[in-house]
Amino acid sequence: MVLALVLVVGLPVTGLTAARAVLFPQVDSPERVDAIVVVAGSNDDRYVYARSLAEEGVADHILVSQPPSGTGRYAAAIDSYCTSTPVTARDGRRIDIECFAPDVDTTEGETTAATRIAHERGYRSLLVVTYWGHVSRVRMYFEQCFDGPVYVTDTPRPTSISRRYALLHETGGYLKAFIRPAC
């Protein structure tokens, strides 16, 4: 009886909370961080946006997930982005772009690799760039694995992923992140 009550009340509440986190995420705009992290994705402008943020002075370092599963135009674009380092900002600052292979080709693997590199480099604060539906799950993973302040933002030009697809995919991932922490 108690289990049935927990399921009847708990599942819808959990589902609504996860749906809210996916569809209406908290997006951050910090003035300055030690590094910007770009988690993988091919259908939006997250790489261009991360570089733009760095050029505006938000950070001097960009860490970019370069999954081994990338193919075709996506892989070529990431390769080109990764070889463009260092970049000189308009104000003369040097911006370093460091690409890394995720520990596992998942958001969890990107998180563990990026936070390990951040610790090794002495970064104390991070801004993670992803797409709108991924913001809350990325925040959860990075907050599980990184000791310092973590900010997460989406791109100004959103991906064409449908809200329905994002809700289904990211809600499942969000629940997985809640049940099985990355770190």
Regions found by a protein language model. Give the residues of each.
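N-terminal type II signal-anchor transmembrane helix
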Residues: 1-27
